[in-house]
Amino acid sequence: MNAVDLIVEDDAWSSLAGKTRLVEEAISAACKELPDRTPGVVAILLGGDEGVASMNAQFRGKAGATNVLSFPAGEHADNHLGDIALAHGVIQREAEDRDIALADHLRHLIIHGFLHLQGFDHQQDDEAEVMEAIERRALARLGVADPYPNEDPGPGPHSE
């Protein structure tokens, strides 16, 4: 299992009970789907929209907050895999718009961010299919509904 360093920066997250357990379970579920994963420590920032918007502008050149940002640590980071930053307001609004629990949406985005730290991407359709299949399986381990219910689940990386 990968270790998690949880940082709660925005007080808006205080209403979510069991944050530490939720984060650790999401990372654990993702790890179970990645037997060849790179082990290490993941820092997870539960932030606000303003802070994530600032990071989005600084590191991606994009205006506004986004739900999740992943920052791989690179080759010379010793045991640190990277950082995942999550914006409470964006995630809360998305959860409400999709009529899903905030905790379930957060689990999904943590898994999504962790997969980026493991080298997965979704820029191309085939990459997205693989990544989404892993997300689906990891979320199913947690009893979380498919976040892509109207899409073909694709073959996934472990299909024969």
Curated annotation (Swiss-Prot):
Zn(2+) binds at H112, H116, H122. Transmembrane segments: none annotated. Gene3D superfamilies: Metalloproteases ('zincins'), catalytic domain. It is an enzyme of class 3 (hydrolase). Its cofactor is Zn(2+). Keywords: Cytoplasm, Endonuclease, Hydrolase, Metal-binding, Nuclease, Ribosome biogenesis, rRNA processing, Zinc. Its EC number is 3.1.-.-. One of its GO terms (cellular component) is cytoplasm. Belongs to the endoribonuclease YbeY family. Single strand-specific metallo-endoribonuclease involved in late-stage 70S ribosome quality control and in maturation of the 3' terminus of the 16S rRNA. PANTHER family: ENDORIBONUCLEASE YBEY, CHLOROPLASTIC. This is Endoribonuclease YbeY. It comes from Maricaulis maris (strain MCS10).
